[in-house]
């Protein structure tokens, strides 16, 4: 379920299995990117992909950072499928913005080198679930 409400930020709520989107997102591309990011988080719950990174999001900064990277990678794949991504850095949905977001979280991941492949694999699973290609 998706609710576009007046919250100051967008999020996924496990309590009611709902993506909450800020009604003030700046443009269509950014809206979809944010929606896909939060939708990716929703795949981590028990009964779906049951990701440790989602289950322990609030208890470990390392796992929180990993979950954010998974969600952003998944959103990037979905945006590319919808032709919403761009190499134009003036575009609000440029690959540069995605890279910057992931790099910010990367600093909090203890062993980035061995973790990156796992994160990409988890993002691919989330993407497949959302697209219904499992």
Describe these PLM feature segments.
Residues 1-34, 42-50:
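Active-site scaffold of zinc-dependent metalloenzymes
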Residues 38:
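Walker B catalytic acidic pair
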Residues 62-63, 76-134:
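Long, well-structured alpha-helical subdomains associated
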Residues 12-15, 24, 52, 72, ...:
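Surface-exposed loop/turn and secondary-structure junction residues enriched for glycine/proline
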Residues 29, 33, 43-72, 88-102:
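Post-HEXXH active-site segment of zinc metalloproteases
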């Amino acid at each position: 379920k998706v609710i576009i409400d007046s919250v100051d930020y967008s999020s996924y709520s496990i309590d009611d299995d709902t993506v909450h989107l800020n009604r003030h997102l700046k443009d269509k591309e950014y809206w979809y990117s944010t929606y896909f990011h939060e939708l990716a988080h929703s795949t981590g719950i028990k009964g779906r992909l049951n990701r440790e990174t989602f289950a322990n999001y609030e208890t470990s900064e390392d796992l929180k950072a990993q979950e954010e990277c998974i969600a952003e990678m998944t959103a990037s794949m979905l945006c590319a499928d919808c032709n919403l991504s761009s190499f134009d850095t003036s575009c609000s949905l440029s690959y540069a913005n995605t890279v910057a977001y992931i790099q910010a979280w990367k600093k909090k991941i203890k062993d980035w080198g061995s973790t990156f492949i796992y994160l990409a694999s988890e993002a691919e699973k989330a993407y497949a679930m959302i697209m219904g290609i499992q």
